[in-house]
């Protein structure tokens, strides 16, 4: 969250609401009935954490309202009734959800004006394009969204229910095979950090696996909050490999490369060349080292042999949806 015209968000925090597991444990601490974002994160040991956004779509509106309240009053420190608001939504977000979002903004927060933009379209704007295909992968969902001259093509949007949270879960599982045990919601957050700091995508998975068996070159160590040090090797690239091989976690779905290709194939034959040449990655789950090269290699193998393939992974892609929103909302034509 932040202000139009800024080049980066003022506030970045997870969409988590935490409630105390046992009431009255912290006597005299002025205990709240709910904690949001980083505070929920830091007190996770005594809380039960809930994620009101599932697969990119809001499923718990009471908790979502708490998150928005926290955003306006605690993070941005603004009166919502004094500022027009730009919200973003997942592609193919149900119309009822958009209406509910609008209702809460006008009725609960009294915003003077609001607009809801599709996330992937904003990412494309942020990359300086108006035509291309965006592969956006966050915590709960991934989408491939072909966009032509600023408009998303809804018939060709594909959704893949595989994203950051699944990778974290998979890493928890394969670390267990190594003899490390991570099970609680609090421990999941530790594993997420391991994933973000140490994982990478192999250009050639099988070859990387062979290398890791004979050499310790891929091994890295990580210090847990309690001071214990764990060693992680092949898990580093086995974890995000799931993006290209969902069958590894028992999912019958196409990987992100094939989903992108399928999305392009659903578009008019005349615009495919423009899409192949402008494949834009966005979202936190595209932050792995090696992802652009691997994506390029895999799509080149699927596409017609003469086709020019270009995969763009902008350095700011973790926040490119927000940056695109900042650009859009600061245009005078848009404000009118």
Curated annotation (Swiss-Prot):
Q: Which superkingdom, per the lineage?
A: Eukaryota
> Cross-referenced PROSITE patterns, in alphabetical order?
ACTINS_1, ACTINS_ACT_LIKE
Gene Ontology MF term list: ATP binding; hydrolase activity
Residues that span the membrane, as ranges: none
Q: What class of enzyme is it?
A: hydrolase
**Location, primary (coarse class):** cytoplasm
Function text: Actins are highly conserved proteins that are involved in various types of cell motility and are ubiquitously expressed in all eukaryotic cells. Essential component of cell cytoskeleton; plays an important role in cytoplasmic streaming, cell shape determination, cell division, organelle movement and extension growth.
Give the record's family classification. Answer: Belongs to the actin family.
* Additional note from the record: There are at least 13 actin genes in potato.
Protein name in UniProt: Actin-82
